[in-house]
């Protein structure tokens, strides 16, 4: 049962967008922004993901969650991050990625609840050509997942190495 819920609720929307436009280092100008997605968070997904990966009562037990400081079920942070990746994969363009370098920050600002509809906004925070590998650039993006009310539920800075069109 867990496998079915996780695959249906996370796996299906996690497919890559059809024929995404490749983004090279030069495409990541300071004003680059993109947004998209509509991910519907279900109670079944929160419960099953919580039971499998983060078995806290406010993720796994509606009665206990109602009595918690959250006043109801909330999604595990690792589920919110996974949904962010599913939304990212659905964007109509994708970096020509050499490697991910990591996250500089990750904040979970507002709890995600069953019934929420999440969307993603991505903008360039910084980009510079690599000194050691001038055929690539280092791009830092600010990513923000919002609920249907426009409230941030996850914000992060992600750094990656992206292929350049030319050698500099």
Please provide the spans of the model-predicted regions:
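Hot-dog-fold acyl-thioester-processing enzymes
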Residues: 2-102, 165-168
